[in-house]
């Protein structure tokens, strides 16, 4: 944390955690962010990791019917803010940015991080924020694609092998200035563009986004058996 303090004394850093997802690959009664790993929920682990940074505050975009999130023991709970999520992740992020714009400045930095990525390391977080601030440029954590990629046709037959040389797999957090990211998402939605992450919105308005080397253990919990993997990763990191 102290690595950033001298840089962020004048700079405000916020986090947005979209957590209104239905967890479609989990059963309807179970949201992946509220599954337990040891004695805490996935989202509590996630907030704990992000809170290693000198955050001014963080916004959790949660489902309208969600009464559970506010009862959790989040790290630095006095810095927690809640807003309603949206239909898709992108709408949840925009709602959180609209909320933030009432209490933060347009030039403040915001990290957007998946609720179901509890294993991100402090080193990765620190490097990401440091790079963004030093270059004054949006950035994302990502890792180079390691596996051989195949492009297939509708019959599941291989058409060709795709060169992986310049391909990176995007992760979160993704960091940008609040005003720029808000404008990018609003513009993309207005133009009916498919937005899969913050970087895709930023790219669509011509904003430069750099990739910062992440780690393969920054997994996103998507399927029930990912919980056990996340538990093992957290255990080994500690």
UniProtKB/Swiss-Prot annotation:
> Single Gene Ontology BP term?
isopentenyl diphosphate biosynthetic process, methylerythritol 4-phosphate pathway
Q: Which GO terms describe its molecular function?
A: 2-C-methyl-D-erythritol 4-phosphate cytidylyltransferase activity
Catalyzed reactions per annotation = 2-C-methyl-D-erythritol 4-phosphate + CTP + H(+) = 4-CDP-2-C-methyl-D-erythritol + diphosphate
Domain of life of the source: Bacteria
Read off the SUPFAM superfamilies from this record: Nucleotide-diphospho-sugar transferases (SSF53448)
The record, for Pfam families, names: IspD (PF01128)
Report what the protein is called.
2-C-methyl-D-erythritol 4-phosphate cytidylyltransferase
Species the sequence originates in: Acinetobacter baumannii (strain ATCC 17978 / DSM 105126 / CIP 53.77 / LMG 1025 / NCDC KC755 / 5377)
């Amino acid at each position: 944390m102290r690595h950033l303090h001298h840089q962020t004394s004048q700079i405000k850093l916020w986090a947005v955690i979209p957590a209104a997802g239905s967890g479609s690959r989990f059963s309807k009664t179970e949201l992946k962010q509220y599954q337990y790993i040891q004695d805490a929920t996935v989202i509590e682990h996630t907030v704990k990791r992000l809170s290693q940074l000198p955050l001014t505050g963080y916004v959790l975009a949660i489902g309208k019917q969600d009464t559970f999130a506010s009862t959790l023991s989040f790290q630095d709970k006095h810095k927690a803010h809640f807003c309603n999520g949206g239909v898709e992740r992108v709408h949840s992020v925009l709602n959180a940015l609209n909320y933030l714009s009432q209490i933060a400045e347009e030039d403040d930095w915001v990290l957007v991080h998946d609720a179901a990525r509890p294993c991100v390391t402090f080193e990765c977080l620190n490097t990401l924020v440091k790079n963004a601030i030093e270059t004054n440029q949006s950035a994302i954590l990502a890792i180079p694609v390691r596996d051989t990629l195949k492009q297939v046709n509708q019959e599941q037959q291989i058409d060709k092998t795709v060169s992986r040389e310049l391909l990176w797999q995007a992760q979160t957090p993704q960091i940008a200035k609040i005003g720029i990211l808000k404008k990018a998402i609003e513009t993309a939605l207005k133009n009916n563009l498919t937005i899969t992450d913050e970087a895709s919105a930023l790219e669509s308005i011509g904003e430069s986004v750099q990739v910062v080397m992440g780690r393969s253990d920054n997994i996103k919990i998507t399927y029930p058996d990912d919980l056990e993997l996340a538990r093992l990763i957290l255990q080994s990191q500690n």
